[in-house]
């Protein structure tokens, strides 16, 4: 399955690859009628969206090496900048084998949801988009062996094609300021800090 949002394609389209011979999964139509695509889809496909998705795929393939390197540099700049300004953070996941545009950090004695709300001008998440309504900690972080408190203290930063150096620097400052404000209110942090 190809999600257009991951490659900056037009809204309203995606792609599903199904091998022709002996598919492992039997597909059922979502909407009956029309008989298009061997009875799996009804209605006419919007040709401009198909062309747009094709162009997005072409651009993603062509620009991937340079884009991945640039995004990786920004991710490292963000991580190192936050690490310099904010004590007691933890990188969630392996330091090496990671997607360039994904940074997940835990902040000791800070609730991830509260931190996210304290940084209204920085787009971050405390879980995946598909589980954003769930109050539970990230099942992925728990499966990685993090305890619930650490998982709840985590934020995910997503970087992409349109991320700028100025946004990285702004995010570093916003995270540092918000964590400092929240930790001042944290009994666990102030007790540990000796304040």
Residue ranges with predicted function:
Residues 103-156:
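Conserved C-terminal alpha-helix-loop-beta "cap" of PLP-dependent enzymes
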Residues 1-29, 33-38, 42-55:
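Active-site PLP attachment segment
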Residues 56-80, 90-99:
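Structural signature of PLP-dependent enzymes
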Residues 42, 46-50, 64-75, 112, ...:
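Generic structural signal for well-ordered, non-membrane alpha-helical segments
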Residues 49, 137-195:
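PLP-dependent enzyme catalytic core of the Aspartate aminotransferase-like
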Residues 3-4, 27, 40, 93, ...:
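Thr-Gly-centered strand-to-loop micro-motif
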Residues 10, 24, 47-50, 75, ...:
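A general structural signal for well-ordered alpha-helical segments in protein cores
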Residues 14-16, 38, 78-82, 87-118:
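Anionic-ligand binding region
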């Amino acid at each position: 399955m190809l999600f257009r949002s991951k490659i900056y394609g037009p809204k309203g389209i995606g792609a599903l690859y199904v091998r022709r011979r002996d598919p492992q999964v039997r597909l059922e139509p979502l909407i009956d009628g029309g008989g298009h695509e061997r009875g799996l889809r009804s209605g006419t496909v919007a040709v401009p969206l198909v062309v747009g998705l094709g162009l997005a795929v072409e651009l993603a393939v062509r620009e991937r090496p340079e884009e991945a390197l640039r995004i990786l540099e920004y991710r490292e700049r963000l991580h190192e900048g936050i690490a310099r300004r904010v004590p007691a953070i933890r990188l969630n996941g392996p330091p090496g084998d990671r997607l360039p545009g994904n940074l997940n950090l835990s902040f000791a004695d800070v609730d991830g949801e509260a931190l996210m709300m304290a940084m209204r001008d920085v787009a971050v998440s405390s879980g995946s988009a598909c589980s954003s309504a769930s109050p539970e900690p990230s099942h992925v972080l728990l499966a990685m062996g993090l305890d619930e408190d650490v998982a709840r203290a985590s934020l995910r930063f997503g970087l992409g094609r349109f991320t700028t150096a100025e946004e990285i620097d702004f995010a570093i400052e916003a995270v540092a300021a918000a964590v400092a404000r929240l930790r001042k209110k944290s009994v666990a942090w102030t007790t540990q800090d000796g304040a």
